[in-house]
Amino acid sequence: MSANILVFDSGVGGLSILAAVREQLPSANYCYLFDNARLPYGELDEQELIQGCVTLISQAVIQCQADIVVVACNSASTLILPALRACLKVPVVGVVPAIKPAAALSQKKHLGLLATPGTVNRQYTQDLIDQFASDCRVDRFGSSELVYLAEDKMAQRPVDSEALHRILAPIKASGLDTLILGCTHFPILREELQSYLGEGVHLLDSSNAIAARVVSLLEPSMSGEIGKSQALYTTDSICEGLRKTLAAWGFRSATAFRDSLMPIGS
């Protein structure tokens, strides 16, 4: 049988993770749920984030008959994984900033972490730095605005280059040689980031590591059969430009998640 993989994010950022997983498991069935009604997660109260995500994902696991859940959001992963794993019987894979490989790659031992304010400031992130990059200088840059710029690009709207350069100016001025993209939205802007920061700055994200983890957790019998069905659910309406982009990713239609839920007992 083909695996049913649920990918969850606050917006379209999780598509960067989905792309990496789909490259490894092209025959799986994919269900993508994004909670765009509460975007961006990096600004939410922690308890609201935990309770809301656990409720949504638990419902989606049933709806999609998921064999595995990928929480394709750094802000959520730094908070909700223990609670989510406690209430689900299927494996849960979270996303963490690629601090360990960045520390190994950096020649200057000078890293930057670009993420939402929530991820940048959490103790979980500090623990990763202490564990894997204690010999490095790690500058942290928090931005929720960059999330919206990534959403604009996916909605086929122009990316505000002035805003982008304002956000990136302190990063460029710092002199770092390795930048960790600690939000799954940010690889969407990889071309724009690289263009402004220059080829001397390495950009790292966690997508390939997450894909490898998903493959390792699935039963071997789930990786070979032909499936390839795809379902997309949102918690708020989306614009026509985003619909067109999502169609190019194989999601031909978007369904309001609340409308999709099966009645209890059905």
From Swiss-Prot:
It comes from the Bacteria. Pathway: Cell wall biogenesis; peptidoglycan biosynthesis. It catalyses: L-glutamate = D-glutamate. Signal peptide: none annotated. InterPro entries: Asp/Glu/hydantoin_racemase (IPR015942), Asp/Glu_race (IPR001920), Asp/Glu_racemase_AS_1 (IPR018187), Asp/Glu_racemase_AS_2 (IPR033134), Glu_race (IPR004391). The keyword Isomerase applies. Keywords: Cell shape, Cell wall biogenesis/degradation, Isomerase, Peptidoglycan synthesis. The keyword Isomerase applies. One of its GO terms (biological process) is cell wall organization. Substrate binds at D9, S10, Y41, G42, N74, S75, T184, H185. Its EC number is 5.1.1.3. Coiled coil: none annotated. It holds the Pfam family Asp_Glu_race. The active site is at C73, C183. It is an enzyme of class 5 (isomerase). GO terms for molecular function: glutamate racemase activity. PANTHER family: GLUTAMATE RACEMASE. Provides the (R)-glutamate required for cell wall biosynthesis. Belongs to the aspartate/glutamate racemases family. This is Glutamate racemase. It comes from Shewanella loihica (strain ATCC BAA-1088 / PV-4).
